[in-house]
């Protein structure tokens, strides 16, 4: 994922979480905040309780790939996604549908725009 699409700084994470705009399901919690950019930015948090490094990295890869294919549907938002324990056993396609569920629930999905 390109640098301009990532949220890395702890201060940015704290600011978005402090706004308390969130939605959740059994696998993910999503915190979000409007930004002034033409695109979304994504921050991912996977707790050490979810497994060893290679398991956490796999979860993060699944999340990044899911958002890469949906970046035209979610614009002008900073999104923090926190993985819960239920995501550990899910295959890739179910991770995507679970993220879709939370995004639709939070009304962050927009009509597809080419770009």
Locate predicted features.
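Positively charged, solvent-exposed patches that mediate nucleic-acid binding
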Residues: 1-115
């Amino acid at each position: 994922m390109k640098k301009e699409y990532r949220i890395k700084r702890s201060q940015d994470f704290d600011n978005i979480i402090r706004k308390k705009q969130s939605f959740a399901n059994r696998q993910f919690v999503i915190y979000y905040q409007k930004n002034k950019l033409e695109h979304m930015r994504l921050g991912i948090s996977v707790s050490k309780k979810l497994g060893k490094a290679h398991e956490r990295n796999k979860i993060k890869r699944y999340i990044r790939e899911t958002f890469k294919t949906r970046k035209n549907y979610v614009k002008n938002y900073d999104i923090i996604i926190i993985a819960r324990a239920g995501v550990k056993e899910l295959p890739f396609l179910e991770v995507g549908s679970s993220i879709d569920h939370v995004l639709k629930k939070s009304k962050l999905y927009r009509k597809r725009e080419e770009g």
